[in-house]
A protein has these predicted regions:
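Conserved beta-strand positions in repeat-built beta-propeller and related beta-rich domains
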Residues: 46-52, 88-94, 132-138, 175-181, ...
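Short loop/turn segments that connect beta-strands within beta-propeller blades
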Residues: 60-64, 102-106, 146-150, 189-193, ...
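A short loop-to-beta-strand structural motif that recurs across blades of beta-propeller domains
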Residues: 55-57, 96-100, 140-144, 184-187, ...
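A short helix->beta-strand "capping" segment at the edge of beta-propeller domains
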Residues: 14-31
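Blade-level signature of beta-propeller repeat domains, shared across WD40, Kelch, NHL, RCC1
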Residues: 295-332
Length: 332
């Protein structure tokens, strides 16, 4: 296994044009932990869940309108994704199911887990083939839901308390995910359901969220040590860069823009910092405080190509939008 430590490099911020412009809206339901926004491909509504408020909701950016759909007490939804038909699917994190919401009627269809131990659906992503891959952190599993039949298949991790967490799906429908309780990244063959794991060199490493660039490289934030990591699955080689805020950074939410730049949030500092890293230059090029709220903690975020924006929810009860400057328009 090859480990390369790279020197951190934070470029000077642009002087003639901001790299990032952040706007926040206060969610009208107090202390509800709005999180994991997802852009509806049919309406451009921003769907999100209230983990502490037991709801699914959407936000209309143009009118600043919020609409809420109630869930049963104790569901504590953790994540939401919206399919090509505009149907939201949520992870019932404390209720052992994945739910499908009909926005027109409010009707919810529940897909229960086949194993009572699979109690906490966590982070989900479509596979592009009529299914949803999802992690189950405390159940120590990763699952796949067939959206048409409702069949759920589960794969157990090899280590106890591996805690599969952040998850992405590649263009072939194959899931890749972090094992937050260990120093491992992993993937599952969608045809055989065979688990393959990759050890990270540092035993103390704890990858939490991740992204995957089109060249097949896996990027992760090491939450415990304060590093950005690059894993080449073909060779197992790992390169790491110290985060701008160092060991206290606690990198959490992560996404990738349409220029394959990596964005993540340092949650160990207040206000939280939205940081950009360019794999082309191997440099951190942007560092923006999440203001005015400070955010508390940003746990997950998504990039919307149409508006060149990153959407996120905050523990301080805001929904946020960060408009990103394209590489060619940045002025150093």
């Amino acid at each position: 296994m090859l480990l390369t430590l790279a020197l951190a490099a934070v470029a000077a911020p642009p002087t003639a044009r901001d790299t990032v412009k952040i706007t926040e809206w206060t969610v009208p339901w107090e202390t509800s932990r709005p999180r994991d926004p997802y852009v509806d491909p049919t309406t451009n509504r921003i769907w999100f869940v209230g983990q502490a408020g037991n709801y699914v909701a959407y936000f209309v950016p143009g009118s600043a309108e919020f609409k809420r759909y109630e869930l049963d007490a104790g569901v504590n939804p953790h994540n939401i994704i919206v399919d090509a038909d505009g149907t939201p699917w949520y992870a019932g994190n404390r209720a052992g199911h994945i739910g499908k919401l009909d926005p027109a009627t409010g009707k919810i269809t529940k897909y229960p887990m086949p194993d009572p131990a699979a109690r906490d659906p966590h982070t989900m992503m479509f596979d592009g083939k009529g299914g949803i891959w999802f992690s189950l952190q405390n159940a120590n599993m990763v699952g796949h839901l067939n959206q048409k039949t409702g069949e759920v298949k589960l794969v157990k991790m090899t280590r106890p308390n591996a805690r599969p967490y952040g998850l992405v799906v590649d263009e072939t429908g194959q899931p890749w995910f972090c094992e937050f309780g260990t120093n491992r990244m992993a993937t599952i063959d969608p045809k055989t359901y065979q688990l393959k794991e990759f050890d990270l060199p540092a035993e103390q490493a704890r990858p939490r969220r991740m992204a995957r660039t089109p060249d097949g490289i896996i990027w992760y934030g090491d939450y415990s040590r304060g590093f950005l990591g690059r894993l080449d699955p073909k060779t197992g080689a790992v390169t790491e860069w110290p985060m701008p805020s160092g060991a206290r950074s606690l990198p959490y939410a992560m996404t990738m823009d349409d220029q394959n730049r990596i964005w993540f949030v340092e949650t160990g500092v207040q206000p939280n910092l939205l940081v950009g890293f360019d794999p082309m230059t191997e440099k951190f090029f942007s560092k923006t405080p999440v203001l005015p709220s400070g955010a508390g903690t940003i746990r997950h975020m998504v990039y919307d190509k149409k508006t060149r924006s990153i959407w996120f929810g905050t523990d301080s009860n805001q929904l946020g939008k960060a408009v990103i400057t394209p590489r060619g328009e940045m002025i150093p």
